[in-house]
Structure formats: structure tokens, C-alpha cells
């Protein structure tokens, strides 16, 4: 139980505090649209799995939002860039670089995907399952709602 709380605080600190100083030094990439909603989702997952910060942030317009657990909402390209900067750190630095998300099932309704995925990584003791809603519009990721909880990841000892 103590180990779970330790990781909860590490992940929360990484996602909410640590990236701010990093993102100040980073130049936001140009916005890059995709031809279809499926291409937006595919680009997001491929960039996420490769921890390609430029490709991740290039998908989000200025007014984009990411809805995290407990009502936390990350709004705007800079804040989203900061979020992904923390996520893309190595595991020893509190990030999750090396995690791989694979789609189990995904349904497109309008421009929104309801996607069930499973995450695996060399540093995880077991696969982690979750679901996200990806809201696409005009070839971009307009918003995302996630069930991802870094504190629920079971890390190898």
C-alpha cells in the first residue's frame, strides 16, 4: 500500500509540477492536422508510444483540453506540452517513457473515439487497462478524457 502511494505522489508530481520548468525552455511545435479522425488517433498513439513530444503536442490546438482523474483539466497547448514533457521522462525520473498503449477496441461516434486500451512496459509488473475518449475535429485532437491513473500502475520491484 505504501508503495502505491509513493508512485501516486511521484506520478502526480511529475504530471503537475515538474514539467513546468522544462516546457518554458521548449518551443511548441507547429500544429499539424491529420486527414481523418482515425489518422488523428493513430498519430496520437504512435507518438505517445514513442514519447515523441513534438508529434504529441502538434496535434492539439490552443483551446484543447485533457481531462484527468479527479476533475483535473489541462487546458491549452503550453499546459498540454508540460503534461507530456513529464510523461515522456524516463521511469527513473518519474516519467513513463517506454510504456506502450495498444488499442483493444475503439468505436468512432461522430468525431469522438471511445477507446479501450492496454498498456505494457518493461518496468510494469503487469499490464494496465484503461479507456479514453478522444474528441477530434478539423484533423486535430480537440480534447481527451482519460481513466489513466499512474498510481494504479504496478511497477516491477
Residue ranges and their predicted role:
Residues 44, 56-57, 64, 76, ...:
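Hydrophobic pocket/interface hotspot
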Residues 8-18:
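Bacterial N-terminal signal peptides
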Residues 81-127:
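Surface-exposed, charged secondary-structure patches
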Residues 60-61, 119-121, 148:
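Short beta-strand segments enriched in hydrophobic/aromatic residues
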Residues 1-9:
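Bacterial N-terminal signal peptides that target proteins for export
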Residues 65-75, 89-94:
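A short gly/proline-enriched turn/hairpin at secondary-structure junctions
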Amino acid at each position: 500500500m505504501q508503495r502505491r502511494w509513493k508512485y501516486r505522489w511521484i506520478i502526480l508530481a511529475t504530471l503537475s509540477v515538474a514539467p513546468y520548468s522544462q516546457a518554458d525552455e521548449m518551443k511548441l511545435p507547429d500544429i499539424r492536422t491529420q486527414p481523418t479522425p482515425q489518422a488523428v488517433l493513430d498519430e496520437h498513439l504512435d507518438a505517445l508510444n514513442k514519447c515523441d513530444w513534438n508529434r504529441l503536442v502538434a496535434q492539439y490546438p490552443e483551446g484543447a483540453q485533457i481531462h484527468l482523474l479527479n476533475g483535473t483539466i489541462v487546458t491549452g497547448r503550453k499546459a498540454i506540452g508540460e503534461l507530456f514533457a513529464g510523461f515522456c521522462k524516463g521511469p527513473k525520473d518519474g516519467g513513463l517513457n517506454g510504456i506502450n498503449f495498444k488499442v483493444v477496441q475503439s468505436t468512432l461516434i461522430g468525431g469522438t473515439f471511445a477507446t479501450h486500451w492496454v498498456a505494457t512496459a518493461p518496468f510494469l509488473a503487469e499490464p494496465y487497462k484503461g479507456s479514453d475518449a478522444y474528441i477530434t475535429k478539423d484533423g486535430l485532437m480537440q480534447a481527451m478524457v482519460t481513466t489513466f491513473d499512474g498510481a494504479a500502475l504496478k511497477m516491477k520491484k
